[in-house]
């Protein structure tokens, strides 16, 4: 059959990334406590396309991923990138993979266990000049406004916030380690299941520990900077303000801290 993708293209324009996006696929990932966890990932995979090829072979991306989906870890992702480059005759390959990750969490007072969902994943690139690998977590937390507490006779506005941490490491850093740093740096963590004694504890703890998004970002940055396994990091904190129709945002990475 005629291979249309391999036809010669005369426009002389190379493409940086071609591939597939938003592929949903069952995967197994490493879990610090239970060794392995089954989940469903959202996956983007790309390669470069030379100027003289009309198109890439999209089906081959899934053929490659299908070999490795039962064990997603840093070593496997490196193999996926190598296989993509070899199979598609490319100079570079990139993968972005994110998935729900569940941890058992005890309520602070009653100690009742329930599962808490986090968004975790990896982003990796392998090219002629450089290789990059990032571990990513997104963690929902609570912030309570220090200014609101200071100027109010009682109470203060509080809300959920989303923390996103990306790290480049010299050795394995568990998702759980990054999740703990994010939750420890907030006014208070979130919980799936709270009874009345737990709710009282969480409400009072947040009030006693007010944080701006700037405070959360800086406190996380200090913890990451002090971790010898982490070579580079980026932190983003977005607070879904309960008394405004806009969000508050703060961002820091290790590069700016070196200046």
Curated annotation (Swiss-Prot):
Residue ranges of the TM segments: none
The reaction(s) this protein catalyses: GTP + H2O = 7,8-dihydroneopterin 3'-triphosphate + formate + H(+)
InterPro entries for this protein: GTP_cyclohydrolase_FolE2, GTP_cyclohydrolase_FolE2/MptA
GO MF annotations, alphabetized: GTP cyclohydrolase I activity
Keyword Hydrolase: yes
Catalytic activity, EC: 3.5.4.16
Leading EC class: hydrolase
Domain of life, source organism: Bacteria
The protein's name in its UniProt record: GTP cyclohydrolase FolE2
Taxonomic classification: Bacteria, Thermotogati, Thermotogota, Thermotogae, Thermotogales
Encoding gene per record: folE2
């Amino acid at each position: 059959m005629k291979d249309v993708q391999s036809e010669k293209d005369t426009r002389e324009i190379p493409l940086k990334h071609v591939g597939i996006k938003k592929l949903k696929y069952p995967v197994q990932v490493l879990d610090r406590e239970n060794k392995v966890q089954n989940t469903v990932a959202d996956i983007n995979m790309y390669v470069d396309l030379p100027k003289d090829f009309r198109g890439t072979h999209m089906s081959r991306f899934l053929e490659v991923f299908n070999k490795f989906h039962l064990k997603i870890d840093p070593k496997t992702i490196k193999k996926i990138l190598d296989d993509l480059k070899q199979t598609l005759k490319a100079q570079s390959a990139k993968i972005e993979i994110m998935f729900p990750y569940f941890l058992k969490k005890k309520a602070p007072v009653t100690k009742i266990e329930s599962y808490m969902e986090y968004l975790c994943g990896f982003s990796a690139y392998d090219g002629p000049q450089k290789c990059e690998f990032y571990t990513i977590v997104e963690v929902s937390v609570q912030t309570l406004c220090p200014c609101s507490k200071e100027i109010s006779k009682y109470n203060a506005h509080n809300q959920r916030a989303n923390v996103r941490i990306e790290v480049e490491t010299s050795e394995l850093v568990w998702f759980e380690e990054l999740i703990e740093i994010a939750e420890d740096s907030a006014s208070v963590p979130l919980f799936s299941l709270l009874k009345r004694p737990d709710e009282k504890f969480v409400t009072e703890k947040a009030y006693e520990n007010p944080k701006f998004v700037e405070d959360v970002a800086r406190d996380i940055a200090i913890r990451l900077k002090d971790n010898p396994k982490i070579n580079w990091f980026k932190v983003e904190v977005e607070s879904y303000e309960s008394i405004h129709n806009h969000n508050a945002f703060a961002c820091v990475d290790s590069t700016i801290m070196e200046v």
